[in-house]
Amino acid sequence: MAALRVLCGLRGVAAQVLRPGAGVRLPIQPSRGVRQWQPDVEWAQQFGGAVMYPSKETAHWKPPPWNDVDPPKDTIVKNMTLNFGPQHPAAHGVLRLVMELSGEMVRKCDPHIGLLHRGTEKLIEYKTYLQALPYFDRLDYVSMMCNEQAYSLAVEKLLNIRPPPRAQWIRVLFGEITRLLNHIMAVTTHALDLGAMTPFFWLFEEREKMFEFYERVSGARMHAAYIRPGGVHQDLPLGLMDDIYQFSKNFSLRLDELEELLTNNRIWRNRTIDIGVVTAEEALNYGFSGVMLRGSGIQWDLRKTQPYDVYDQVEFDVPVGSRGDCYDRYLCRVEEMRQSLRIIAQCLNKMPPGEIKVDDAKVSPPKRAEMKTSMESLIHHFKLYTEGYQVPPGATYTAIEAPKGEFGVYLVSDGSSRPYRCKIKAPGFAHLAGLDKMSKGHMLADVVAIIGTQDIVFGEVDR
């Protein structure tokens, strides 16, 4: 009978399936002998908590997971401290900057110097006045002869001598060639740091030609030791003045090409205008000099205000900026190169004949021809290069308008043949002290533009 009932049930299911639109309903067979038991709800809830028998202390406990989502915490944002250099290619030497950044904004910029310190001022105290001269080539190793000129003027002031006119004109001539060397390096490496490579390659070819002038007049491409106390070491070789004239005539065309690339370039203007602004008051308070001072609108040039050698006999203009930003300083350097070409042309036209050293055997060595015939000349030569010449006791501060600014030498003599003290005032030292002020509030990438516009060389900063 049971099998018959099951068979009838399956027939009913088949009929429901075959009927269109009919849903399948399986018959529910209640289990025999099973009685469902429903407990008391309150009694059952005591087993649903975190503990089986909760007390007052454990009643608020929750079953796991206790913390599906961490509660939000107070976010603490700290400024990042970043080391810029001393291996950075845009550091222009061994500059190390400890910078505090808020995102990419510079909040603090602390320069750390001294990584190129060689004890130059102390070493000079153990050398004669002539032996100390090559140390000045290694200070600002981009504008070599200007450093020599400052030291030579200081020694000549203590000795109370004045070099011959031809020597002074040669000094001014090569001082302006050195200014061209420095400004080419400053402008093109500044552009290279900001991504413009072409000016660097174009103008370094011209720089090599000026190194050739150095080599022809002194035998060395960079560290010349050419300008010495009492005059210059050698006279100009034949044909050199003609070559310098030809170079200066063509170099103005190179400057035109430089300005075509940069002056109205949209990217260059965006990266330099209103970047690193220094007001005239701030420039004076920080002790800026040179282009860093003139770019802020102060017309101060030692070649005009306190002329040395024959700068009072040449005509040139002093370019001055108005905004005090990186762009104004770039324009000042380009215009200074044009004014240097004017001075070079005047030096070539006004170059007088005559001696190139002071006519005093106690200071300048005698000529080779005299040494072969005169015993006194041989003795003077020997004593000059072994003991050196005695400088009367006294002290002097002598400053010149170097390409980077006011380069000063404070020289103290005790009457011996060696300096008692030689303090060197480097323009880049004061400029680097203003880096924090100039870069505060700018982006990290703008710090590179500010370092480039300061024209820093660490030979003179660290000494």
From Swiss-Prot:
GO terms classed as biological process: cellular response to oxygen levels; gliogenesis; mitochondrial electron transport, NADH to ubiquinone; mitochondrial respiratory chain complex I assembly; neural precursor cell proliferation; neurogenesis
Modified residues (N6-acetyllysine): K62
Protein name: NADH dehydrogenase [ubiquinone] iron-sulfur protein 2, mitochondrial
Similarity-based family: Belongs to the complex I 49 kDa subunit family.
Transit peptide: 1-33
Subunit composition and interactions: Core subunit of respiratory chain NADH dehydrogenase (Complex I) which is composed of 45 different subunits. Component of the iron-sulfur (IP) fragment of the enzyme. Interacts with NDUFAF3. Interacts with NDUFAF7. Interacts with CERS2.
Enzyme Commission numbers on file: 7.1.1.2
Residues reported in the UniProt entry to bind [4Fe-4S] cluster: C326, C332, C347
A family per Pfam: Complex1_49kDa
Native organism taxonomy: Eukaryota, Metazoa, Chordata, Craniata, Vertebrata
Annotated membrane topology: Peripheral membrane protein
GO-annotated cellular components: mitochondrial inner membrane; mitochondrion; respiratory chain complex I
Matching InterPro entries: NADH_Q_OxRdtase_suD, NADH_UbQ_OxRdtase_49kDa_CS, NDH1_su_D/H, NiFe-Hase_large
Cofactor mode of binding and number, as noted: Binds 1 [4Fe-4S] cluster.
Catalytic reaction list: a ubiquinone + NADH + 5 H(+)(in) = a ubiquinol + NAD(+) + 4 H(+)(out)
Localisation: Mitochondrion inner membrane
Organism in which the protein naturally occurs: Gorilla gorilla gorilla
Co-factor requirement: [4Fe-4S] cluster
Functional summary from the UniProt entry: Core subunit of the mitochondrial membrane respiratory chain NADH dehydrogenase (Complex I) which catalyzes electron transfer from NADH through the respiratory chain, using ubiquinone as an electron acceptor. Essential for the catalytic activity and assembly of complex I. Redox-sensitive, critical component of the oxygen-sensing pathway in the pulmonary vasculature which plays a key role in acute pulmonary oxygen-sensing and hypoxic pulmonary vasoconstriction. Plays an important role in carotid body sensing of hypoxia.
Gene (name only): NDUFS2
First-level EC class: translocase
SUPFAM superfamilies: HydB/Nqo4-like
Entry keywords, A to Z: 4Fe-4S, Acetylation, Electron transport, Iron, Iron-sulfur, Membrane, Metal-binding, Methylation, Mitochondrion, Mitochondrion inner membrane, NAD, Oxidoreductase, Respiratory chain, Transit peptide, Translocase, Transport, Ubiquinone
GO molecular function: 4 iron, 4 sulfur cluster binding; metal ion binding; NAD binding; NADH dehydrogenase (ubiquinone) activity; oxygen sensor activity; quinone binding
PTM field: Dimethylation at Arg-118 by NDUFAF7 takes place after NDUFS2 assembles into the complex I, leading to stabilize the early intermediate complex.
Modified residues (Symmetric dimethylarginine): R118
